[in-house]
Every structure is written in structure tokens, then in C-alpha cells.
Amino acid sequence: MEHHHQHHRHHQRDDGEDDRQSFGVPPPHVDAPPQPHGLYQSQPHFDPYAPTPQAPAPYRSETQFEPHAPPPYRSEPYFETPAPPPSFGHVSHVGHQSPNESYPPEHHRYGGYQQPSNSLLESHGDHSGVTHVAHHSSNQPQSSSGVYHKPDENRLPDNLAGLAGRATVKVYSKAEPNYNLTIRDGKVILAPADPSDEAQHWYKDEKYSTKVKDADGHPCFALVNKATGEAMKHSVGATHPVHLIRYVPDKLDESVLWTESKDFGDGYRTIRMVNNTRLNVDAYHGDSKSGGVRDGTTIVLWDWNKGDNQLWKIFPF
């Protein structure tokens, strides 16, 4: 009887072959242990128009992705894999990033990108692109420590090294003592007194004073500008502006030598050419009748006319 019952059950499995062909895998036997879900069953045919099935719980700890999810909409090109690194000299900004990369990248964290000069770029030979070492203004001098230092405004021109340490003087006219002799735009002029203006500082170099004298026996001197290293030079004649020339201390050049006259009161004297005492240094139209001294008054040579604009004082700073 028991054998007949087992045969009957076997016969039922034969009858189920047709059902299996029509409906796929038969339900598990009631006495058989349950099979792990989703591991040993054959996958059904994928229907692209069928609703998305509920994904089974993951068996392992891998990261799960939604099956067949459409790629996200992006305003910039979408890449399945990270974009290749940019070539040297060009930086690309892509609208996505690697999961292991911080955002924003460290070298673009503060403000927009500016292409530095090639001298401030270094490539270390890796595959991460260009490394930006520093971004500096080409317009400011940099020290090795990266600290900006102003140029040494007190540094003498090279040709005046022999005059270093000597006291400087200011030169002003009796017509306007608050205006000093200075250099501006390559010309000798008068400007409001400013002791901090190096161009208003002059050296009275008397190197050849014992060798060269004027017709009255007065010793010569040169007026050398501390800021430019230029000496005031004779003009081509009366009514013409004086000139400037690079001073060469070891060269005797009469065209840069001047003398002072006798004292006309309060220490004011005329300044005239060593080889022509008739022509005097003159603040052009600086006398009161002509309008007086102003900022930018031109310095010329003129015949003596007894004006205050022809009387000068050379006084230490």
C-alpha cells in the first residue's frame, strides 16, 4: 500500500511536466527545504515595458543601484567614468566629480581661476594634471620668502657712490623760499618744499673747487641730484632752460660747474656759469611783476636784472 502511494505521487510529478512547460518553474515540494530567494532561480525574460520590479534585499554588502535607472540630466557632458586629466596649460571644469574627491578641489576653493605665468607653474610628473604652486602679481617684486618689500628709496644711483654719507642741500629762491629746486619729467623746476622728496635733495660737490674758479676768483661746484644722479648743466644761452646730464665725478666737465656771487643780503647770492658770470640761474617769470613762482616754474639762464627770482640760497637739509 505504501509503495502504491509513492508511485501515485511520482505519477503526479509526471503529469506536472506539461504545467511546468506552460508556467515555468513549479512550486517547491512541500517536503523539500525552501530555496534561497533570488539565487538559484532562472531570471525571467526582461520586458522593457513592464513596470520596474521591486529589487530583492541584497545578499551581500555591495552598493546597490536602482536597475535600469536613466542617467541624470546634466547641463554638461555626462561621463560614465571620470574624465581624463586636463593637458598642461589648460584646465577643464566638468560638472561632476569623483566620489573620493573633495568639493570644491583645493586649488579652486577660493575664487575663480586665473592662468598664472609659466614661471609660477610646476609639473611634478604625476597624472593629476597641473599643480598650481603660487599665484602672484607680476607687477610687485617678490622675495624668496614671498613677502613684498618696497624698493629702497634711499639707495643712491651707482655713479654717486663716492658721495654717500655727505649732507644734502636744498636750493630755493628769494622770490619764494617755500619752493625748492627739483627735477620733474627730466626738467629742472621749482616745486613746493617737501623734505621727503629725494628729487629736492642735491649734493654740492666741490671736488674741483681748488682747481677751477670763475673770473672773480670764486670756487666752482657742481649741483648733483640725489634721486637721479644727474648734474645741472649750462643751457645753450640766455633765456634757455638749463639741462641735465649724468654726473661723472672723476671727469672734469666745465659745463656742469657753477659759482656763487657775493652775498646780496640774508645769505642770498646769484648762481652763474663758471665760464660766463654774466648768465645767472633764473626762475622764469618768478618775480612778483611777472606773476611769481608757481609749482613747475622753469629754471633758465638770464642776464642779471637784480630780481629776487635770480637770488638763491643753498642751505643744508
From Swiss-Prot:
GO terms for molecular function: carbohydrate binding. One of its GO terms (cellular component) is Golgi apparatus. The keyword Cytoplasm applies. It is found in: Nucleus; Cytoplasm. Residues 168-315 form the Ricin B-type lectin domain. Residues 1-157 are annotated as: Disordered. The keyword Cytoplasm applies. Its main location: nucleus. Residues 1-11 have a biased composition (Basic residues). Expressed in roots, rosette leaves, stems, cauline leaves and flowers. Induction: Induced by osmotic shock and salt stress. Induced by abscisic acid (ABA). Induced by methyl jasmonate. Induced by infection with the fungal pathogen B.cinerea and the bacterial pathogen P.synrigae pv. tomato. It comes from the Eukaryota. GO terms for biological process: defense response to bacterium; stomatal closure. Residues 136-146 have a biased composition (Polar residues). Keywords: Cytoplasm, Lectin, Nucleus, Stress response. Transmembrane segments: none annotated. Residues 25-36 have a biased composition (Pro residues). Lectin which binds carbohydrates in vitro. Interacts through its lectin domain with glycan structures containing one or more Lewis X, Lewis Y or lactosamine motifs. May play a role in abiotic stress responses. May play a role in abscisic acid-induced stomatal closure. May play a role in disease resistance against Pseudomonas syringae through its involvement in stomatal movement. Interacts (via N-terminus) with ATS3A and ATS3B. Plants silencing EULS3 exhibit an aberrant abscisic acid-induced stomatal closure. The ricin B-type lectin domain binds glycan structures. This is Ricin B-like lectin EULS3. It comes from Arabidopsis thaliana.
